[in-house]
């Protein structure tokens, strides 16, 4: 039996359902704050899942409009019920259905590394961001592994090279220590998250990097 195609993987059993039911909002907000000011901006939650970032951008950040885009239907349906004031769009991150220079702020939290064509996805991110606009991308360190069918991983230096090659200025770099250790009750996953948290005490081994990008 062949492996499921990426969209089939997410549609058949949306494995982030626990994120919809028990979101780690402080973790998302820590990243969103790197894009402040959000008030009055047009905001895109790229690879949104159920769109908690779009919700926070609107309700806490004061964004004028927030769009949540994902290529799987199920998370969009879940998110639409929770945050009806956001715009919900089903689309592909490598061919974004938006005009050039549409958004002031973009968040891609754990999404661009799953694009089938990373350079094309970054070119699209650059295209839809306004001049002077900012994006925060949260991407995995070189050793991180998940069960998702497509996943690009790199060191911090490699990520910096890739992002600059796409035309972005790097305005800041931070780290993300990953999901809460007791996010769920699966013993193996708890042990893995505990190990990741310990590894993250060593700066080069932080779980994920947070790059704040600016379009010149």
Label each region the model flagged.
Residues 136, 157, 161, 171-216:
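A C-terminal cap/extension of S-adenosyl-L-methionine-dependent methyltransferases
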Residues 143-158:
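Acceptor-substrate binding/catalytic loop of class I
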Residues 119-131:
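A short glycine-rich, Lys/Arg-flanked "PGG" loop and its adjoining helix->strand segment in the class I
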Residues 133-139:
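Conserved beta-strand signature within the Rossmann-like core of class I S-adenosyl-L-methionine
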Residues 1-36, 41-49, 195:
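Conserved class I S-adenosyl-L-methionine
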Residues 50-95:
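Class I SAM-dependent methyltransferase SAM/SAH-binding core
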Residues 107:
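A conserved beta-strand element that flanks and buttresses the S-adenosyl-L-methionine
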């Amino acid at each position: 039996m062949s492996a499921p195609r990426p969209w089939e993987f997410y549609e058949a059993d949306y494995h982030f359902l626990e994120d919809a039911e028990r979101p780690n909002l402080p973790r998302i907000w820590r990243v969103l704050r790197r894009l402040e000011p959000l008030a009055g901006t047009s905001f895109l939650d790229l690879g949104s899942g159920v769109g908690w970032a779009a919700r926070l951008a609107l309700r806490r950040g004061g964004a004028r409009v927030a769009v949540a885009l994902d290529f799987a239907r199920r998370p969009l349906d879940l998110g639409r019920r929770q945050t009806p004031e956001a715009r919900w769009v089903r689309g592909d991150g490598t061919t974004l259905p938006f005009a050039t220079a549409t958004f002031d702020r973009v968040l891609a939290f754990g999404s661009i590394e799953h694009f089938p064509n990373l350079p094309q996805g970054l070119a699209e991110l650059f295209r839809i961001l306004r001049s002077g606009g900012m994006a925060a991308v949260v991407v995995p360190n070189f050793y991180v592994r998940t069960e998702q069918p497509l996943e690009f991983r790199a060191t911090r230096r490699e990520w910096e090279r890739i992002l600059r090659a796409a035309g972005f200025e790097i305005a800041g770099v931070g780290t993300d220590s990953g999901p809460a250790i007791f996010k769920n009750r699966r013993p193996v996953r708890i042990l893995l998250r505990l190990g990741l948290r310990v590894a993250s005490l060593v700066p080069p081994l932080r779980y994920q990097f947070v790059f704040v990008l600016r379009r010149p």
